[in-house]
Amino acid sequence: MKTMRKQIYKKAYWLLLPFLPLALANTFLVKEDSKNVTAYTPFATPITDSKSDLVSLAQLDSSYQIADQTIHNTNLFVLFKSRDVKVKYESSGSNNISFDSTSQGEKPSYVVEFTNSTNIGIKWTMVKKYQLDVPNVSSDMNQVLKNLILEQPLTKYTLNSSLAKEKGKTQREVHLGSGQANQWTSQRNQHDLNNNPSPNASTGFKLTTGNAYRKLSESWPIYEPIDGTKQGKGKDSSGWSSTEENEAKNDAPSVSGGGSSSGTFNKYLNTKQALESIGILFDDQTPRNVITQLYYASTSKLAVTNNHIVVMGNSFLPSMWYWVVERSAQENASNKPTWFANTNLDWGEDKQKQFVENQLGYKETTSTNSHNFHSKSFTQPAYLISGIDSVNDQIIFSGFKAGSVGYDSSSSSSSSSSSSTKDQALAWSTTTSLDSKTGYKDLVTNDTGLNGPINGSFSIQDTFSFVVPYSGNHTNNGTTGPIKTAYPVKKDQKSTVKINSLINATPLNSYGDEGIGVFDALGLNYNFKSNQERLPSRTDQIFVYGIVSPNELRSAKSSADSTGSDTKVNWSNTQSRYLPVPYNYSEGIIDADGFKRPENRGASVTTFSGLKSIAPDGFANSIANFSVGLKAGIDPNPVMSGKKANYGAVVLTRGGVVRLNFNPGNDSLLSTTDNNIAPISFSFTPFTAAESAVDLTTFKEVTYNQESGLWSYIFDSSLKPSHDGKQTPVTDNMGFSVITVSRTGIELNQDQATTTLDVAPSALAVQSGIQSTTQTLTGVLPLSEEFSAVIAKDSDQNKIDIYKNNNGLFEIDTQLSNSVATNNGGLAPSYTENRVDAWGKVEFADNSVLQARNLVDKTVDEIINTPEILNSFFRFTPAFEDQKATLVATKQSDTSLSVSPRIQFLDGNFYDLNSTIAGVPLNIGFPSRVFAGFAALPAWVIPVSVGSSVGILFILLVLGLGIGIPMYRVRKLQDASFVNVFKKVDTLTTAVGSVYKKIITQTGVVKKAPSALKAANPSVKKPAAFLKPPVQPPSKPEGEQKAVEVKSEETKS
């Protein structure tokens, strides 16, 4: 188990959120970076059985309960319906279908929109209420409804439904030859069998006119419950009133040895308990009429787009209509449903017509509206809805065809093509067939049917269909006629044999290898020989699916508001396909649609080891067209080679998984009308033994996770009805199961000539072993491959238990369960200090760690950017193995920071103080701590400052030397130049002085005589004074010369 689960490891981004206010007891988180709750957020829609607060918020009375709910763009949409509702049908007048005001049954279903009005936790406030009205009925439609009858649905107590082999029960073959029906008593005694059907055997039977059928205005049939204390027999008739006994006797099948009707009531079909489990409404012990049941069942599933709300039915009772409500509608607006009869589903009508032709050997040769399927007044399709969802503002839906009614209304009886079909209802039902391990060669030979020898074991799987034919008013203009049963078989192929034998109930395949022999619900048999073309068996079901655009929804709304008979809605991107009704496959037998069985087509169908095999539940394996849990989502990865599957959807059907991959192109639907270019790819993966052991009727919830590409289907099978009609715990059965389906899987590609198989990785597995002792269970949340959360009610209090995987079986972890606490209405389990709870335990270091680790020289930014240092500030004690945690730091100042933990939860994801969902804080309550005393400046700031100063001085010195040395050289050159100049000046001065001296001397000679006369006067020395200035060079001429030289140097440089 553990190895298997590792192969399908789920990265489930889910967090358990218990105890929400306003009785939204459970909601769950997504990835921490998610800013929005969407329709695809895993478990964003709360799952709980107690919704009284939402009911009161919607201003509805206590009779209302929640049928479905979804979240669209953070708003919550809830579908409410009342168990007190009563609807009536009147064949005359204009208001044919209406709420019954005389019995205070005017309690229609509602869709209510809520919004969150707080930023702390969730507090829902009503935005708008939409009422779901009853449908308009045109005159043509009324002609159909007047004579339409509905057959009893299957329940866990339906006759012939419990076919699974039980431990300790002996199953035997009963041989009845031609004319030996009266030997039943001896056969019974020989094998020690009871006169009434017991869990290990089933009785075939023939219904007389009107048995188990009801018109819309009549009460739903109910039959005597089984009493296991009387060896499988029914309760004594004294426990019934005479009216109830008489009604039950008239509607019970004939099961006596000779095939005649019994004078006393001693047989059964269903119980009140079983009918209530599928949604049948009662007034005390009396079921309400059929039309009320159909309305109540039709308001079961909800999907929301940007502009529309769509409501459809369920998998138990047929839906004849669906609602499309405009979100802009006023609260008091009349929101009428659209008839499926007024909706064209592409590929569907041809498939349905072909199915009837194949079954009855009847082929229509004209296209006039007077023939069966071309006239709305003679057809009434109904669907068992497996689910609806919305993706990218488009609706995805799927379901099974519950049945239809049609007539060959040709007036000629002379034509060989019409004589055998005139006045015959061309219809089919949801019944399955006889099963045989060896085929029907020995069972059905020639035309003997069951009057011939029975040399092999076989069983009848089902005995009831849903919508069945009627006859009497079979012409286009006929208005009167008796109501009688018309069998869906040609007149000349009817069998008159009475089928009343006890038959071995070995669960086998649904097809014969020597031809197809089928018994219908009414005790008539026909067969196709092996030399004839392989035709779909009546065990095959018509599975309808598609994607609906906003424009098509608007058309459906317009049709609903119309009272005309010619308003048609075209849903273009829909398809139909035959699906087999697998029980146990036999080798060499062809599957539906020409597919080979898994054993012969190269597929590896593995039964996982370590899983406890559980005997298939009779109901789950007998209801032929049962399907649950359609869930769609954005699928970015293509599934089939060469195809881009933008949207993916998964639905579980009886026997396997259907994957639908929608290819709408560039976020818009394909506009092509070419049916060969299908916008939808289809794949069917058969269940293995492990999945087949899960009772699909116990389905609770489905989630899709886009990141992992996994769908998780949750089933609650802890309580099952026993064969004595009482709710008793099944002690040897697991409480919960989770079927996990991957985005990819076995992909079937079919053409006209061959059938090939592409095998992609598949993650189809059952997570079982989750068992709870609580009485009221609301769901299972797979958190990871190691942990699951079981949500239950214990003494009217919501309780969360955490289960841990222990070698494939999940066992409760008491410590973790106790630690999942609330946070005063917050969204997440709160953290508890000084205790190892689900978040583990965080212990912070003292502030002295800064000095001890020499961190006082580091700054806040350094610490924040160094996780190794940051994580040394705390010690983490995990709550479970491999749980991890880290610290998230916030800068408080230049010298301090605040830290808080970021912890891994059970879902594998990390959460911190800032985690939100839809923008709302989680308020987990993680602790925080401030560390102070870090360096205001980094340790490198002072050294760098000093170094910078020294560097600058050094640069200046270098620059100074670089400039000073050349200037010194220039100065020396200047000095040398000055010396030379001054030498030249001195030479010149000397020369001039010599000239002057010679002049003076000569002048003195001229004046010698007069000078001699005055020789006594010595103070006259003028020449000496004249020569003095040239000998002393002034400073100014020196400066002017330096400037010139420097300029010259600059010029040179």
Curated annotation (Swiss-Prot):
Gene Ontology biological-process annotations: cell adhesion
Membrane-traversing stretches: 946-966
Compositionally biased region (Polar residues): 179-207
Subcellular location: Cell membrane
Observed phenotype of the null mutant: Probably essential, it was not disrupted in a global transposon mutagenesis study.
Signal peptide (residue range): 1-25
GO cellular component, one term: plasma membrane
Domain of life: Bacteria
Region (Disordered): 162-207, 224-261, 1024-1053
Membrane topology: Single-pass membrane protein
Composition bias, Basic and acidic residues: 164-175, 1037-1053
InterPro entries listed in its UniProt record: MGP3_C, MgpC
Keywords: Cell adhesion, Cell membrane, Membrane, Signal, Transmembrane, Transmembrane helix
Subcellular location, principal: membrane
Protein name: Mgp-operon protein 3
